[in-house]
Amino acid sequence: MSNVCTIAWIYGRVQGVGFRYTTQHEAQRLGLTGYAKNMDDGSVEVVACGDEAQVEKLIKWLKEGGPRSARVDKILTEPHSPHETLTDFSIRY
């Protein structure tokens, strides 16, 4: 498999419920780099880079609702070319 980067915007009850923290934990478990960031519109932006199959697993996990305390109503994804080198998976503020 090849390495890819995907950017996702997750909408629903995804802020104030530990969404970024649990996304970081899941991404690290899958060996991915990138970040999770709360957006002003109430969504969460996630950039995930790594092995294509592992990125797909994270996106599937996000679509299934992520952490139990969250409620995902909609997720949009597209290929992404980061403007920086991502060496780990972080929470951004």
Curated annotation (Swiss-Prot):
Substrates-to-products reaction catalysed: an acyl phosphate + H2O = a carboxylate + phosphate + H(+)
Key words of the record: Disulfide bond, Hydrolase
Active site per UniProt: 20, 38
First-level EC class: hydrolase
Signal peptide start and end residues: none
UniProt feature coiled coil, ranges: none
InterPro entries per record: Acylphosphatase, Acylphosphatase-like_dom, Acylphosphatase-like_dom_sf, Acylphosphatase_bac, Acylphosphatase_CS
Cysteine disulfide links: 5-49
EC number: 3.6.1.7
Gene3D superfamilies found in the cross-reference section: 3.30.70.100
PANTHER family given in the database record: ACYLPHOSPHATASE
Name by which UniProt lists this protein: Acylphosphatase
